[in-house]
């Protein structure tokens, strides 16, 4: 262990099929983190000056470690399982930023300033369906932990494919924790950092700020 989490303020777990998605997506890395770094993780999230983000495979890891949704390290309260389509999906999807989200990563992305709270990002996964018991889903909704939802062309959350690429319950594409300092999402915002990276960038007009975070 050459480094210690106490020396850092941000833990970022990117996408990328850790350990080849053996067993299930994110499982092995999650087991390693909870087996060898549970104490460090607990101390890390207890600090007030830390942030954690997990994208795609990173979101799967955060779910399987128990960091999301309820910060219960070693306890899984939800899962990200096989897409309803039965195959890997790589496509652009439309998302709505939840206006009541407490996630600090979204602090400057208010509805009025960010294309009316609608964004487009790529998804690229085979196991992205957010699934949990009803009482867990109800708690997530009650505590405003949802950050992003898949939406249709009318801007409404949807369960229909392909707008919802995996069949996630309540069209959930991303969630945060009760502090708002941990964010996990299946879509890839890092693939859209310049407006020109969107396939319709010449046709679509965006408000100041743009989904590309320029």
Task: Give residue spans per PLM region.
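Cysteine-nucleophile active-site neighborhood
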Residues: 19-102
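Acidic active-site catalytic centers that drive phospho-/nucleotidyl reactions
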Residues: 9, 60, 190
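Short beta-strand segments
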Residues: 12-14, 54-56, 122-124, 186
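Amide-donor transfer/coupling interface in amidating biosynthetic enzymes
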Residues: 2-3, 41-45, 75-214
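N-terminal cofactor/phosphate-binding cores enriched in small/glycine residues
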Residues: 1, 5-21
